[in-house]
Amino acid sequence: MEIAGNSSTISPTFSTPTKKRNLVFPNSPITPLHQQALLGRNGRSSKRCSPKSSFIRNSPKIDVVNTDWSIPLCGSPRNKSRPASRSDRFIPSRPNTANAFVNSISSDVPFDYSESVAEACGFDLNTRVLAFKLDAPEAKKPVDLRTQHNRPQRPVVTPAKRRFNTTPERVLDAPGIIDDYYLNLLDWSNLNVVAVALERNVYVWNADSGSVSALAETDESTYVASVKWSHDGSFLSVGLGNGLVDIYDVESQTKLRTMAGHQARVGCLSWNRHVLSSGSRSGAIHHHDVRIANHQIGTLQGHSSEVCGLAWRSDGLQLASGGNDNVVQIWDARSSIPKFTKTNHNAAVKAVAWCPWQSNLLATGGGTMDKQIHFWNAATGARVNTVDAGSQVTSLIWSPHSKEIMSTHGFPDNNLSIWSYSSSGLTKQVDIPAHDTRVLYSALSPDGRILSTAASDENLKFWRVYDGDHVKRPIPITKTPSSSITIR
C-alpha cells in the first residue's frame, strides 16, 4: 500500500519512519475501510519523539492490519453504528425495534432458578443429555397400541370399603325376659314374624306391619323356656319349665296340642319337617312326630347334664347337640347312638350352627370358661378351625350371603361380632357393643339382612348387618312341606 506524494513503500506488517515528515492526505473522500483504520489508530496510545519535533510517532499494530482487512465476503462493510438484527432457527429475521424485548427474553436465567426448576422436574443439571445410561426396564406385558386405543376411558374404580352399622336400626322393649344362659327365648320365622318369650307369656311381632300380639300364656306354676318356628312359619313350638311342649297355630292364634315326655324343663327345640326334637335339663333328647297321636318316636341319651343347644342340618340327615357337660354330639338321623362325640370345649356348649353353603360344616361355641369357637367336619369328625372369641359365646349364626359367621357374646364384652371364614382361619370384621349386659338370644331375618338380639337389659334390638352388594335375592318361601302336616 502506498501513501500519496511519496514513492517509498510501507510494509503492511511493520515500518519505522526515517525522516521527520508530516502526513498529509489529499482532499479525497475517505473510504469506510480507511475510516476504520483511522479509528483504530486514534484509540491507541501515542508518544512524542522530542520537544523539537511536532511529529507524533505512531507504531502500527498488527490488529490494525486485522481491522483493515476484515472485509465481508460480499457487499459493503457493515456499519458499526447500526445494530445487527437477531435471528434463530425458528425466526429467520426479527425487526430491529424488538431487539430489546428479544434480548430480555434470551438473557441468561439465574442459576438459582434453573436449579429449582431442575429439582422440581427431577433431573440433574450436571447430567449430560446424551450420556450413556442403562436401558429402561421392560414392561411386564407387551404394549399393544390397538388395545390401548380401544380401551374405554373410564376412571379406575376401587371397591368401596364395607361399612358396618354400629347402632341398632330398631329397639323394642322386652320387660321380664329371663336372664338364663341355658334358655332359648327368641326366634324369627320365614314369614317375617318374631317370637319372644317374656316369663310366662309369648308375644309375636310382625316385622312387615309392626303389629304385636300375645300368642300364649302359661300357668303360674311354670314359665316359657324355649320357642322355635316351623320351617314355613305356620306353627310355633313352645317348651315349658315343667317339661311340656306346646304347639300353636299362629294364624288362628290357638294351641293345637301339648306333648309330654320330659321330666325337666325343655330349654331347646329344633324342627326337621314334621319331626320336632326337644332337649331337656335331664340330658335327654326326644323326637316328636307331630302328625300322630303317639308323638314320641325316639329318644337320644348322650348328655349327662342339661341340653342347651340343638340344631338339625338343613337336609335332615344329622342332628347336633350341645350340653352343660361341655360335650358336642353329632347324631345320624336313623341312629340313637352318636356318630361323633367332641369334648374339646371347657364350658357349656349352647351355640350350635350348621353352615348353609357347606352342609357338613358345623360350628360350636363354648361358655365363660372356654370362649372358643370350633369348626367340625361332620363327615369325618375332624376339627378344621378354631378361634378364641375372647368372651362367652351365646349364639352362632351363619350368613346366607357370604362366607361369614356372626357370634353373640356374654361376659366380659357383651358384643356382637362378624367373622370372615376361610379354610385357613377366621378374620374378625367388626365388634359391635350390642347390650349393657350379656347377649343371650339372637335370630336372623328370613332375608338374612337383619339380626335381632335380646339381653337381660330388657331390650330387643335389630341390627342391619348386611346390605347393598353383600345381599343376594332371598329364596322364595313356600308352604308345601309343613302345610301337609296334620297336627293332632
From Swiss-Prot:
WD repeats lie at residues 178-215, 219-258, 261-298, 302-341, 344-386, 388-429, 434-473. Residues 7-17 have a biased composition (Low complexity). The keyword Plastid does not apply. Keywords: Cell cycle, Cell division, Mitosis, Repeat, WD repeat. Interacts with cdc13, mad3 and mes1. Belongs to the WD repeat CDC20/Fizzy family. Required for mad2-dependent spindle checkpoint activation. Promotes ubiquitin-dependent degradation of cdc13 by the anaphase promoting complex/cyclosome (APC/C). PANTHER family: CELL DIVISION CYCLE 20 CDC20 FIZZY -RELATED (PTHR19918), FI02843P (PTHR19918:SF8). This is WD repeat-containing protein slp1.
